[in-house]
Amino acid sequence: MERIKELRDLMSQSRTREILTKTTVDHMAIIKKYTSGRQEKNPALRMKWMMAMKYPITADKRIMEMIPERNEQGQTLWSKTNDAGSDRVMVSPLAVTWWNRNGPTTSTVHYPKVYKPYFEKVERLKHGTFGPVHFRNQVKIRRRVDINPGHADLSAKEAQDVIMEVVFPNEVGARILTSESQLTITKEKKEELQNCKIAPLMVAYMLERELVRKTRFLPVAGGTSSVYIEVLHLTQGTCWEQMYTPGGEVRNDDVDQSLIIAARNIVRRATVSADPLASLLEMCHSTQIGGIRMVDILRQNPTEEQAVDICKAAMGLRISSSFSFGGFTFKRTSGSSVKREEEVLTGNLQTLKIRVHEGYEEFTMVGRRATAILRKATRRLIQLIVSGRDEQSIAEAIIVAMVFSQEDCMIKAVRGDLNFVNRANQRLNPMHQLLRHFQKDAKVLFQNWGIEPIDNVMGMIGILPDMTPSTEMSLRGVRVSKMGVDEYSSTERVQPHRSRVGCSSLL
């Protein structure tokens, strides 16, 4: 009552009212920001002023029996005063030091089992070899990569059920462990973690790391398997790269590799059977990789590869709308087209029946050593922005894009007959015939393409028909970017401040 009276008196003074209403804290938004919710809004500041206090930590009362009131230097470790608002004790940071030095020790047998991913990482790094360092312009492409080596391939839901069963077996809630891998992992982990004294929540977090694939969309210049991604910060910078050989394999990378090989074999065998779809599905169901059914792996594994995508599509799973041509993965990022058969005449007067894509489209092209953005209309290349490791890689990308554009001047640049065959001695389709022809020799293609004067745009340069760089002229519609061009992620929202494409600001 006394306090309320005092506050009333204060409020009756005009100065008090002025201070409270005219200062910036009167903004309701600011008050709300710092007082609503339990989330700490300024952790660094909070930590600073807490640590300036003598007893910034609260602990259970049992601490008084376990820790002496003073340490060897006579400094007070805990205060007899209770924490306001709870029946806990106020404790000094010195108590933590005392506990770490003199507190009880426990068996460490479970640590390597729970923190297995970390122990394995240390081993991989110990046995890996680093060096030498090369200084050169790094062409990085943002790709979806696997960031935790050594994981199983369970879905988030499957992993959640396994974790609940292992860590909190007595909790209520229906858990259905159906897949072979779920049952095996649960049995194995229950045995490993018997009498484990590590906090259950920590065990749950670590299990999640071991069981679920985690992916991120990161700029990468070299290897994309998870054992390379875990050392990305050591192997590539903006203008340098360090050679690295991992000190061990991990099963998820092996599975990804095996999946690609298995899918390719299955697709190859299915194409020659009487009923390709039925035969492909039958093979997918009867194949196992590392003891796990291939169909289960296909459901979880995000590997993007042509044969893997064919198997996924056959099973009715969603696949990304990318396709391969000339060693590049094309992803349409905007526009649309319809296909129409058209007969065209080559420079050798040979008739080719090609499927023309009518309409405006934009693509990203991603290859091993070069990447590009391609904008095209019906049988016309509008713009190609390419970046690559070297002249050869850039030339490869330009040839593929020129053929893909289906321009008339490309078809007229053909000299001689097109009669390329595949390994089974079957004639290749016309688009691949054209591609093979120009991959052998692109001189006429580049000469016939035409050149244009270019504007001076930062980070961009022209390229002449003999593949030498130029700041004045360039092949029509073609520019070379010094920065990488990112692989497009359809699943990730593009933040406005970090453009997916290194040169979008220039277009």
From Swiss-Prot:
Per the UniProt entry, the signal peptide is none
Q: Which InterPro entries match?
A: Flu_PB2_2nd, Flu_PB2_CAP-bd, Flu_PB2_middle, Flu_PB2_N, PB2_helical
Cysteines joined through disulfide linkages: none
Out of the domains of life, which is the source? Viruses
Provide the alphabetized UniProt keywords. Host cytoplasm, Host mitochondrion
Intracellular or extracellular location(s): Host mitochondrion; Host cytoplasm, Host cytosol
Does the record carry Hydrolase as a key word?
no
- Plastid as UniProt keyword: no
Listed GO cellular component terms?
host cell cytosol; host cell mitochondrion
Sum up the protein's function in the record's words: May participate in the inhibition of type I interferon induction through inhibition of the host mitochondrial antiviral signaling protein MAVS. The knockout of PB2-S1 has no detectable effects on laboratory infected mice.
Question: What name goes with this protein?
Answer: PB2-S1
Q: What is the lineage of its organism?
A: Viruses, Riboviria, Orthornavirae, Negarnaviricota, Polyploviricotina
